[in-house]
């Protein structure tokens, strides 16, 4: 958090801790935000308001945006930070556990047993242990094994949960004598997505727009892609280089991505529930995943790499997709696309022999980053135009790409009129 906070300050952001949104008024040319701060209430004028304030988003509620979905009471999760099992149970090379009375638990992020999910990881001087106890279906309640009055979690409660999940005693201790313990308990699972990602000049990103099971860890990718997608579009509109209608593409692109995460996170949750039927289903999935094509399909789904945006008429297979991971060599310099795409501007990659595509943007060089050279790695294109969020707006595989189409895309997405 400190590193991120310093970075945004370095970029000129006014970061304010301890300030709470209490309301806002929208006008034709801006938003007036009502804030309750440490020194009292005040008003903050802005062009736009972006709510990145989590699953209980005050921004979403004040905007009157519905949050349909489901809240189930079928799960109790417990997390313990700063605790470890006996040292001689841990494989020093792999991190796997050898538990007497149970056997070997692989160092997977989540390990599904017949009666729940278990995870135990140690990274450097930090340690984390998780249990997840689930009912057999989302329609059942699992509320009988914790106190309704939210009694503070104890180490004994964590150990008891581990025993229910694994059927074996696992003694736990602090990672060091003076290490503080952070023990937590969470009830139920929310799977919800905002009915709209926008209301006038107010936008939602991250958990304010969608909540879901954490299994598979898709939330970070999803939320960051929301922010980057909206961020470059807001910047372009506020700078006057793009038409405000560009902002309409935010919800059109990101809400379907959120829907897919809600869908596959529920499916993953179903695959870790207790029961012999689920065990059989997992066995079937294991066989299917031996096929590399199936494994890649699911990997792309969970990571979000299968998202494809509608970027218009360009029919190239890369158009609307995440830019491939390759590098561009020019003379004695080789740079990966990820390095080239850090300016916040559109990136034109020209891989043609005589760099004919790059000349199209010579009169607008201050508004676009151009990289010309030969490809290092697998890329099925001779030229690509990459948006600031990493998605391909235009691509061609022709030795002499059609530059009129490139000009049209530059104008459509970035308001750039190239000669």
What does each model-identified segment do?
Residues 1-282, 286-289, 419:
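Core Rossmann-like FAD-binding/catalytic domain of the broad FAD-dependent monooxygenase superfamily
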Residues 2, 6-12, 26, 160-164, ...:
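Helical substrate-recognition/capping region of FAD-dependent monooxygenase/halogenase enzymes
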């Amino acid at each position: 958090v400190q590193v991120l906070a310093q970075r945004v300050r370095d970029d000129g952001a006014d970061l304010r801790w301890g300030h709470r949104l209490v309301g806002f008024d929208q006008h034709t040319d801006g938003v007036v935000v009502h804030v309750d701060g440490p020194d009292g209430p005040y008003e903050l004028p802005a062009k736009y308001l972006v709510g990145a304030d989590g699953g209980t988003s005050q921004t979403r509620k004040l905007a009157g945006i519905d949050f349909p979905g489901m809240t189930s009471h079928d799960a109790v999760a417990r997390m313990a930070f700063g605790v470890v099992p006996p040292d001689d149970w841990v494989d020093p090379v792999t991190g796997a556990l050898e538990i007497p009375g149970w056997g070997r638990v692989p160092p997977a992020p989540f390990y599904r047993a017949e009666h729940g999910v278990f995870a135990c990881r140690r990274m450097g001087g930090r340690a984390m242990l998780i249990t997840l106890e689930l009912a057999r279906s989302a329609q059942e309640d699992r509320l009988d094994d914790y106190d309704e009055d939210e009694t503070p979690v104890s180490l004994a409660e964590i150990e008891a949960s581990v025993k229910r999940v694994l059927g074996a005693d696992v003694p736990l201790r602090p990672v060091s004598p003076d290490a503080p313990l952070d023990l937590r308990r969470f009830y139920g699972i929310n799977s919800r997505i905002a009915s709209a990602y926008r209301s006038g000049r107010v936008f939602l990103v991250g958990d304010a727009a969608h909540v879901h099971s954490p299994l598979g860890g898709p939330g970070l990718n999803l939320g960051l892609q929301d922010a980057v997608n909206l961020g470059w579009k807001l910047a372009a509109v506020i700078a006057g280089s793009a038409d405000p209608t560009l902002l309409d593409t935010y919800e059109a692109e990101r809400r379907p991505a959120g829907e897919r995460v809600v869908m596959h996170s529920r499916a993953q949750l179903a695959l870790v529930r207790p029961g012999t039927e689920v065990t059989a289903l997992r066995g079937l999935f294991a066989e299917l995943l031996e096929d590399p094509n199936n494994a890649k399909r699911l990997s792309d789904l969970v990571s979000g790499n299968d998202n494809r945006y509608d970027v218009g008429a360009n029919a190239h297979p890369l158009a609307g997709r995440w830019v491939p991971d390759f590098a561009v060599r020019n003379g004695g310099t080789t740079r990966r696309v990820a390095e080239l795409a850090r300016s916040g501007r559109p990136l034109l990659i020209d891989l043609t022999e005589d760099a004919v595509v790059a000349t199209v943007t010579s009169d607008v060089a201050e508004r676009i980053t151009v990289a010309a050279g030969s490809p290092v790695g697998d890329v099925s294109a001779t030229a690509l135009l990459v948006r600031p969020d990493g998605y391909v707006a235009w691509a061609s595989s022709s030795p002499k790409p059609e530059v009129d189409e490139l000009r049209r895309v530059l104008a459509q997405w970035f308001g750039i009129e190239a000669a």
